[in-house]
Amino acid sequence: IDVASATGLPAVQDSLDPLHADSYGTGVLIADAETRGATSIVLGLGGTASIDAGMGILTALGAAAHDSRGYALPKGGAPLVQLDHIDTAQLNIKAGMLDFTLLADTRATPVQAATMYGPQKGAKGEQVALLAGAMLQACEVTGTDADSAYYGAAGGLPIGLSWLSHTLWGSDEHVRVLSGGTHVAAALGLPEKIASADLVITGEGRFDEQSLTGKAVGTITDLARQAGTPVGIIAGSFEHDTDAYCAPLSQEGSLAQQLAAAAGDIVKQL
């Protein structure tokens, strides 16, 4: 299941609501998959509009987030600052007991789901701080280590599913949180291809601090370094240091011409 297709930024780009967006749609797809016979699910994380610690998924599966007075919390990440416990009286046990593999697109921690990715989901100033506090509270209630890498992916979605596994199975053995970049690279045979290459060229629109936290470009440059293969990065702009060969696009001519010129610049640096 591609989480971005159900809970993604593209569908709501013109009406971002970082405080109240949720992952409910992904939960609906999980429940539907179980009724169709699925026993394990792979979730491709990334590109979500929500920062809700996966509570939307839990809600779709019948759980309910409650405050200390026993009242159900409104949807979204912001209300989680009042999270006291999660009610499981109506939980869809069959769907909850599926095996989950979560392919994360970032090594971000739960708090970084808000501080690093909140702004691109529309969060500003105090909203970022509020969502960061909400992630900490969700970690506290679910027993999640707030410093866990990858648990900030997709708005903290691994937090809720790991809690689900602990609740139903007594451990998180039925939820695997993996580096999506590393997983896909292995499936494509990239480690072997990069090791036998003379040069690797990769890139993205903007190279910044997020690029090296589990994104494709960071995964590829890591593999190249491990193999001792020279690596060059082409990007529209560079806002973070790297020891790779770099070539920003010139913004002159067609895109094809810019890419060709940038590739030439990398070759000249070798």
Segments and roles (model prediction):
Residues I1-L45, A49-L270:
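N-terminal loops that bind phosphate or other acidic moieties
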